[in-house]
Amino acid sequence: MRTKSIYLLLLLAIMPLCAFSQSKSAFEIKDGHFYRNGKVTPVLSGEMHYARIPHQYWRHRLQMMKGMGLNTVATYVFWNLHEPEPGKWDFTGDKNLAEFIKTAGEEGMMVILRPGPYVCAEWEFGGYPWWLQNVKGMEIRRDNPEFLKYTKAYIDRLYKEVGDLQCTKGGPIVMVQCENEFGSYVAQRKDIPLEEHRAYNAKIKQQLADAGFNVPLFTSDGSWLFEGGATPGALPTANGESDIENLKKVVNQYHDGKGPYMVAEFYPGWLSHWAEPFPQVGASGIARQTEKYLQNDVSFNFYMVHGGTNFGFTSGANYDKKRDIQPDLTSYDYDAPISEAGWVTPKYDSIRNVIRKYVKYTVPEAPAPNPVIEIPSIKLTKVADVLAFAEKQKPVSADTPLTFEQLNQGYGYVLY
């Protein structure tokens, strides 16, 4: 009897812990709303990419997001960052995605994961590893056996890294995106039948599910591109949509006549190209649109809330028929509410003042800026002549110029 009493006491002691764990992890889409812990909870998110910020600053930037009134952080996952060579994975230092997610959870924030496999993001090759182009029979972003073999390996490996951080297991990850703006690709690749596009999109969603991702899934596209981008079983969200009526109309069309309604990319700034003017977006207009969303039960994700820096050779490029190739800057400041250096901007204050009027939780003050250092004058000394060094290397001879990929050169420079 005494033994049974001890067991009963232990069970009673454990039950509150289990209940806390379950309530802590509860996030669902129900009755046209997002629910967290049984309560309707708008997702007020900001996009911040772990790889564009030194890991020593992650917590500070997350605290700045909280100080703005946000409750969620969204991030892309960059496949080529983590698999620089086939089968060789790296999740250390600034690439430690799990640590970034844990830090967000410690700061009381929800996390939205956007693993692609294609991510755009003005990132080199849209996040695809360069070596995919050397795989025989490979056709990227298609219902192609070789391509899907590698996407499965990536998604499975990603799950091993962050799967236990889903809210279904007590972690902060509440949503995962399927593919990325796929409707844009469908619109551009009319040479591929729509049914094949949809088959590929569905297979990426299935790979996420098969790996073990079991939080709500979603897609993100321009509202006029849902036909190609939406996929059954995933919440369709709109990018850059300011018209509330149109947002609700198109989401209803592809989501059983109900929400929740979310703008997965709400642009408080814009990207920058070399040799072009730096784009600037006014604070007052962004504040008004933020209030409009809050008044109409529309969740949103600021893309970007803090841009950071394209380190190394990670910056990508766009293409414009009038300008040809448009390489992105090393800076990914994005004219975001939090500057590249991690400082408060007038846009930050304007958004914070709006959000504070609508949320029921206390919005903390923004943390103090990180201290800066004064760098003394640096005298450069010639060590070697780069071109002279290159000329001493054994050349590769070919009848026609070879690509970097053909030379197994992922990044850097090639002298032709």
Question: Which stretches of residues belong to each language-model region?
Answer:
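Aromatic-lined substrate-binding rim segments of carbohydrate-active enzymes
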Residues: 58-126, 130-131, 205-210
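N-terminal carbohydrate-binding accessory modules
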Residues: 20-72, 102
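Aromatic- and acidic-residue-enriched carbohydrate-binding clefts of CAZyme catalytic domains
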Residues: 39, 76-88, 93, 121-146, ...
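Bacterial Sec-dependent N-terminal signal peptides
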Residues: 1-23
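Conserved residues at the C-terminal ends of beta-strands
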Residues: 47-49, 76, 179, 306
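Carbohydrate-binding surfaces of carbohydrate-active enzymes
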Residues: 148-162, 169-178, 183-184, 188, ...
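Soluble non-cytosolic domains of exported or imported proteins
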Residues: 56, 91, 95, 145-149, ...
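Substrate-binding/catalytic cleft of secreted carbohydrate-active enzymes
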Residues: 113, 117-150, 156-302
